[in-house]
Amino acid sequence: MSRRLALLGALLMGAAIGLPAQAIRGKVVEAGTGRPVSGAIVEVRGADGYLTKRVVTSATGGFLVPLSTGGRYRLTMRAIGFRPGTREAVDVELAVRTLPDLSLERQLFTLPDVVKFAGGSCVNAGTDRTAFAELLTAFGGALTVVEQAVAHGEITFETQVIERTVRGVTARQRRANPARTLDTIADTLHRPITNWPVHSLSVDSLKRLGFAVERWEDGQGSWTLYGPDPTVLFSPWFLETHCFSMDRPTPSADSLILRFAPRRRSQVGDIAGELVVNATDLAPRQLRFRFAYLPAALAGVTPGGIGGVLDFDREPGGIWYVNRWRVWSPTLSGRQRVGGTELEGRVVSARPDR
């Protein structure tokens, strides 16, 4: 019985939103200077606390949030390198409500300040847990800004995605050409990226199933491996079940590495990895992940041979995005590796949506 192993890199298409009569208009600026903060995430929640809309500020720091109904709303603003800000009790009637400028304070870190918190969330030695938790929150906020800017921003990122499949040749093919051991098939697609490029499951599903899920169809089993997204990486469940630590590559380096790994051995699929960020503002540079554990049914597969890398960049207008990514996994027949799949993508152009 054949089992296929594939790492999903699904990219979902977004839908355009119309402009109703009610809306909130505003501008996010840097406190003290008044400079516009582009690429900030603005979340609007209703009186019940549920998320109503999420938008990204433009190059001028402006935003317009269309609403389906009037009422009282609460705004939260997040941007890389800034402390989150809120605006309470924003009342909207049958009109566009224009707000005064919304200010965000800079949140800068110096290397000595950051490094003294290093040590990890699983050990006590020298770790200021309150400060470490604040840093983890900042890390998670930075990745969330990237994810939401891609999904809800005013920029369309066109990508080139190459899928390579490597598989072993048949015995007849080897007899005809003894030097031939592998076949490589490559497909190239061009499409917009409108979501986090590595597909994940909900936190509730990961709690039950892990990052490796077996599915059956027509008597044939296949395994699907999932990667992390910002919601998963910094969820209470992931923080409780994984160890986190920080280090600096060299004493003079301007970057920090946040490492994470399972707290204990897992009977389901689980991941480890690193997030590389700027030391001063915690802007993300790269996210690397790999499988640390796999289910017993995949005991013949090396977990570290499955994973991915995402590189981040900032476009001239200030929007942060995933610039390049690569994910890879083996292909199995039974419990033997017979090949592999690699998905490699990169942004080739960016244009305003309107």
Where are these regions (language model features)?
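A short, Gly/Thr-enriched small/hydrophobic beta-strand-prone motif that recurs across taxa
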Residues: 19-29, 110-113
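Structural motif
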Residues: 27-37
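Hydrophobic beta-strand segments
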Residues: 34, 40-46, 75, 116
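Short, acidic Ser/Thr/Gly-rich low-complexity loop/linker segments typical of extracellular
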Residues: 47-62
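A short, solvent-exposed loop/turn motif at the edges and junctions
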Residues: 48-50, 72, 76-89
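Conserved "repeat-terminator" motif of extracellular CCP/Sushi domains
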Residues: 91-94, 100-110, 114-118
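Structured extracytoplasmic
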Residues: 115-272, 293-297, 331-354
